[in-house]
C-alpha cells in the first residue's frame, strides 16, 4: 500500500486519500470506497476492499471526508452537501477507469447521490459507475434516522444549542448539528426515488440497530433499474465486519467488477 496522499478538494480543504492495487492504466474495473458517518478510510471494511484491489490487481481509491480521519476540517462543520461535493471531486479527479462504488452507511447515501448528480450533470463520468454496493445504506439518515427519531427534548436542544451529543456504543458521543440536519433535507431520496442503469447490491444485517432492515427495504423500494438485489444477513449488525461478512462484501464487489470487464455474464 502506498502512503497517504492529499488532494486539495472543494473550498481548498486537503483531503487524505489512498490509492490501492494497480493503476488505471491496466483498464480493469476498480473500486471506490465511501465510508460512514465519523468513520475513516482505515476501517475494517475499507481495508478489506483495499486488500481485494491489491490481490486482483485492480485500482482502488478511498479517502477521508473533511473532518474525518486525516483530512482537514472540523467534523461539526461538515454537511451532506460538502461531503457529496468532495466525493464527486475525488471520483472525477482521482479515478479514470470504471469503478464499483462501495458505500457503507452514510457512504451508501453518498454513493446514490453521487450517481444521481453525475447522471444529471456529467453522463460521461456516470458511465464509469459500473455498479454500486450499498452496505447498510443510511439514505435520508438526517431525517429518517435522526430528526424523526429524536425526542422533543433533543429537538429543543438542537434548536437552542445547534448541536446534540448523541450517545454511541462505538465510542465517543456523535455530535449531531442542526446544520447537518437542515442541509440533509436538501438531499432526500426515498420519497422521490432514483433510477439507476447500473447493477446495485444492498447488503443488510438483520440485527442492525442503527440502520434497521426496514430502512434498507425502503432504500431498495426507492430504487429502480434493471438489476437491483438486496441480501439480508441473518444476525448481522451495523458493522458487518466478521470474516464471513467481509468475504461477502468482497465477493459482491468483485463479481460486479468482473462483469464490467466482461469476465462473467
Predicted regions: what they are:
Residues 125-233, 237-265:
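The alpha/beta-hydrolase serine catalytic core
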Residues 37-50, 214:
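The serine-hydrolase catalytic nucleophile loop
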Residues 38, 65-69, 139, 237:
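Alpha/beta-hydrolase active-site loop signature
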Residues 68-95:
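Catalytic nucleophile-loop/oxyanion-hole region of alpha/beta-hydrolase
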Residues 1-24:
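N-terminal cap/lid segment of alpha/beta-hydrolase-fold proteins
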Residues 48-72:
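Conserved alpha/beta-hydrolase
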Residues 90-153:
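Primarily recognizes the serine-hydrolase "nucleophile elbow" in alpha/beta-hydrolase
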Residues 27-36:
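Short beta-strand element of the alpha/beta-hydrolase
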